[in-house]
Amino acid sequence: MSSETVRLRRPNDGDGYNLHQLVARCQPLDTNSVYCNLLQCSDFADTAIAAENRHGELVGFISGYCPPARPDTLFVWQVAVDASMRGQGLALRMLLALVERAAANGVRYLETTISPDNAASQALFKRAFARLGAGYRTRVLFSRARHFAGRHEDEVLYRAGPLVSVHSREEQLQESA
């Protein structure tokens, strides 16, 4: 099944348990409680996106939120893609769709944290930043020594923006060709 046959949609509270199961299958992602996943799918549905296959199964999910002190910023918390859908561009498709929806609500910046050894996430976000026409900066947000007692890699903050609409960016690229 290709990522084009997957339907992207706003999550709902019926997705919470399935999200918990999806994240558990997506090592090395940290699992949260089912309750946390229910909140991500209900209270934070405007800053999340779900991907389901033709059988209605959850095969991808991105959770995020707008930090209260920075309402013009979408912070992407977690990106999960089922193993059967990896390598088909689904994560990028979900991320760009989520950013487009958030931008319509005033979001101008995109943030996430990525550990230094997570090359796949680094590549995903760098591709997204390029598609969005957004420069980015990085800094260690949570350090292995100070915040994780040596038990977790550093979490490096990536901050991109100001964002250009995905559609506007594609139009700019076509005009310059």
Predicted regions and their residues:
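Conserved active-site alpha-helix within GNAT-family acetyltransferase domains
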Residues: 92, 116-138
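C-terminal "cap" of GNAT-fold acetyltransferases
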Residues: 132-177
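Acetyl-CoA-dependent GNAT
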Residues: 21-72, 77, 82
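Conserved GNAT acetyl-CoA-binding A-motif
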Residues: 102-116
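Conserved acetyl-CoA-binding loop-helix of GNAT-fold acetyltransferases
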Residues: 81, 87-100, 123
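A short beta-loop-alpha structural element at the N-terminal edge
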Residues: 6-19
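A short, internal acetyl-CoA/4′-phosphopantetheine-binding micro-motif in the GNAT/acyltransferase core
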Residues: 78-86, 114-115
